[in-house]
């Protein structure tokens, strides 16, 4: 057995070492690279099928990002102690890795390719997302799989007014920008970002500076290829039968143009499918029966190529889109809010034939989503879910768990709105948005952004500004010409070269996602796309503001009411009670839900304000500390010749001296109060040593404040000896309790030292 050869290359990126290593792991994979940045370490493997599956007419690329709990020194908490289904983070990183790799495989290459990225170590400082792209690209680059890479990837932040390369995880939480850019040495391939209203120029500058770092990472991968790269397997793109295309084009005449140029998706699809059926029937009529299936595929492929050319050439040559719009024109928009009864907020956003209904639901802090990514437990108080049912495109498909696409679109809409949400201190509710795509003809994710902003305002959530989104497209020609399209629809997305989604407020960008189908785009194209996106966004915001321009002043009557109080940390146990008995009693009595934070904040979520106030009263009764000047409605629990003892808080009594019972002189305590009476009393003094509380009914009756009493020279009355000895009555000793009361005439027994 030959000795294993290990190859390593390294470079300094943003003050940390990026290392790529091949030859140590997974030798039977077509390509395997370990990428390490700091102490974050990933293994990427790639395997390609030897032949394409028969009948396959698409590129079957699969990218899986596998999170392993051992990477953070944890054991899975489930019953089987094994990793389960992919987390949302794993799915998003899988999609993030797939998008810049896919355009770099040759056209017509239909062999199945599987990329698996496995987490070996996560250091909680360096984001594994960009590193996953680098590792996968390097594995493909050194393999024999046809691939026009390598691809570099980098994360960009914006801290203290400056762009930062690969900010650490703790820093990204404070950053105004979280952007991942990937590209080859020649062009940008993919951008994904969330931002706090950055300008288009700032976003583009972040992409440009990030791409410069990507070039360095590409050079590092090229060094690894020189050390251990395999020769690429031969691949010959399928030969296109242009004569068949020419024959079909001549036979159809201008019928394809007429069929394509219909503003209604269903009509356009019906007309093109009918024409396609005629073409297939005509060009397979003379074929032997056994050749008809193959001939049908050839004719169908040629027809689809002509359809694509017709759509693209009309845009490049004439500036005409299939629905007759100008290149920068947005489809007709209609907006409704409050369309669903009893929900907390709702909005129906329709743009062309894309229609999204977004529902907002407000919940208690206890409704926050608990997230456990690689053993790091966090919570999310804002959640966005995106649903894309089959009827939205007139199709039949099995329903089940959300697909990767649904999760990705939901995450994009979620981060696009994050910048305008109120803080937990301003608005302590948990917020869930659900976008139901009811009809789709392109840009449903951006329609979800618009619908979400509208539904939040309808629900009364105090967002900082409305947010709108629009998707831009791109058509390029072989002669270098290009056209950017505003508000692309389905056919333009499918047959175009770019999907460039921009969301934001009137002040700046809050969300960005760019995917392309070519080998890269230039900064000039991106600058034009940003400019058209801003114009489109402002147009849409104007339409939205005409319906609802600010959050409603009141929450829905069906939304819960949340009130917040602060209790001493040492009172948390008293509020919870033994085994949670006390807090459960409050919840059962009032119908409220109570959530307690470690810092003593208590959130009371109730169906109405009265229930919340009742719960607060009960909580304060358990946790409130008496202070001088506080007024309580107390209950008389004991009467003595020198005054009355009044219970003001659970387990806390104070004494009202006879001189403090009334404005006038009181000879007999029971002339003023009786046992069980409820009276208003003010705390006038708290003994620093014993904690005993002096109360005054007279101060409440006269409206006298503690400050006024002090200025007038009034002092708390001295406590009588009986009260000073310890409360209502001095407790008897155990011997006295056992001895019982003395009989009449019995002399007291002398006390012993041990009594």
From Swiss-Prot:
Keyword Magnesium: yes
A cellular component term, taken from the record's GO annotations: cytosol
Family according to the record: Belongs to the polyribonucleotide nucleotidyltransferase family.
Record-given protein name: Polyribonucleotide nucleotidyltransferase
Subcellular location: Cytoplasm
NCBIfam families recorded: polynuc_phos (TIGR03591), PRK11824.1 (NF008805)
Record EC number: 2.7.7.8
Catalytic activity, as annotated: RNA(n+1) + phosphate = RNA(n) + a ribonucleoside 5'-diphosphate
């Amino acid at each position: 057995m030959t000795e294993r050869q290990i190859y390593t290359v390294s470079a300094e990126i943003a003050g940390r070492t990026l290392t790529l290593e091949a030859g140590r792991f997974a030798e039977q994979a077509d390509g395997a690279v370990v990428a390490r940045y700091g102490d974050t370490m990933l293994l990427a493997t790639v395997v390609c099928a030897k032949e394409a599956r028969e009948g396959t007419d698409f590129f079957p690329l699969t990218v899986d990002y596998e999170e392993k709990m051992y990477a953070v020194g944890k054991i899975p908490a489930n019953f089987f102690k094994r990793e389960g289904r992919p987390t949302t983070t794993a799915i998003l990183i899988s999609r993030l890795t797939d998008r810049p790799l896919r355009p770099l495989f040759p056209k017509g290459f239909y062999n199945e390719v599987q990329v698996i990225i496995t987490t070996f170590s996560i250091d909680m400082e360096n984001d594994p997302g960009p590193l996953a792209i680098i590792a996968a690209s390097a594995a493909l680059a050194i393999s024999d799989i046809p691939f026009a890479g390598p691809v570099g990837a980098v994360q960009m932040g914006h801290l203290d007014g400056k762009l930062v390369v690969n900010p650490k995880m703790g820093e990204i939480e404070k950053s105004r920008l979280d952007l991942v850019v990937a590209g080859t040495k020649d062009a940008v391939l993919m951008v994904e970002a969330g931002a706090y209203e950055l300008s288009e120029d700032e976003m583009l500058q972040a992409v440009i500076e990030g791409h410069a770092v990507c070039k360095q990472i590409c050079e590092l991968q090229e060094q690894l290829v020189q050390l251990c790269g395999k020769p690429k397997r031969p691949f010959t793109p399928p030969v296109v039968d242009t004569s068949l295309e020419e024959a079909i084009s001549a036979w159809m005449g201008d019928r394809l143009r007429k069929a394509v140029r219909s503003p209604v998706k269903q009509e356009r699809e019906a007309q093109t499918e009918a024409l396609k059926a005629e073409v297939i029937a005509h060009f397979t009529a003379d074929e032997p029966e056994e050749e008809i299936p193959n001939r049908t595929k050839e004719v169908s492929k040629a027809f689809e190529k002509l359809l694509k050319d017709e759509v693209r050439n009309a845009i490049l040559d004439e500036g005409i889109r299939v629905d007759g719009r100008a290149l920068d024109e947005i489809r007709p928009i209609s907006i409704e809010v409050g369309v669903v009864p009893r929900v907390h907020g709702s909005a129906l956003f329709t743009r062309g034939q894309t229609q999204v209904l977004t529902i907002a639901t407000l919940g208690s802090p206890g409704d926050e989503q608990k997230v456990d990514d690689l053993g790091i437990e966090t919570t999310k108080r804002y959640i966005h879910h995106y649903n894309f049912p089959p009827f939205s495109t007139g199709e039949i498909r099995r329903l089940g768990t959300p697909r990767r696409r649904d999760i990705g679109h939901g995450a994009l809409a979620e981060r696009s709105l994050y910048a305008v949400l109120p803080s937990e201190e301003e608005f302590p509710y948990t917020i869930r948005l659900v976008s139901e795509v009811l009809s789709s003809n392109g840009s449903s994710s951006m329609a979800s952004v618009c619908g979400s902003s509208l539904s939040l305002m309808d629900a009364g959530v105090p967002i900082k500004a409305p947010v709108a989104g629009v998707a831009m497209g791109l058509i390029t020609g072989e002669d270098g010409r290009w056209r950017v399209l505003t508000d692309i629809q389905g056919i333009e997305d499918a047959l175009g070269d770019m999907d460039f989604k921009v969301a934001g407020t009137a002040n700046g960008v809050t969300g960005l996602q760019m995917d392309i189908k070519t080998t890269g785009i230039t900064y000039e194209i991106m600058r034009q796309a940003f400019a058209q996106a801003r114009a489109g966004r402002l147009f849409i915001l104007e339409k939205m503001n005409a319906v609802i321009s600010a959050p409603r002043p009141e929450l829905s009557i069906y939304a819960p009411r949340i009130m917040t109080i602060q209790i001493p940390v040492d009172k948390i146990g008293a509020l919870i009670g033994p085994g949670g008995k006390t807090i459960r009693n409050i919840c059962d009595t009032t119908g409220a839900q109570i959530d307690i934070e470690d810092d003593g904040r208590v959130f009371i979520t109730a169906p109405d304000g009265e229930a919340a106030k009742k719960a607060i009263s009960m909580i304060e009764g358990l946790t409130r500390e008496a202070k001088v000047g506080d007024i309580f409605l107390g209950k008389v629990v004991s009467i003595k010749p020198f005054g009355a003892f009044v219970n003001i808080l659970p387990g806390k009594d104070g004494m009202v001296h006879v001189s403090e019972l009334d404005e006038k002189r009181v000879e007999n305590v029971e002339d003023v109060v009786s046992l069980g009476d409820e009276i208003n009393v003010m705390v006038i003094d708290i003994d620093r040593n014993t904690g005993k509380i002096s109360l005054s009914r007279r101060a409440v009756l006269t409206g006298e404040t503690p400050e006024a009493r002090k200025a007038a020279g009034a002092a708390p009355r001295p406590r009588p000896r009986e009260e000073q000895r310890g409360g209502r009555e001095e407790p008897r000793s155990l011997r006295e309790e056992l001895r019982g009361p003395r009989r009449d005439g019995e002399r007291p027994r002398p006390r012993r030292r041990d009594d």
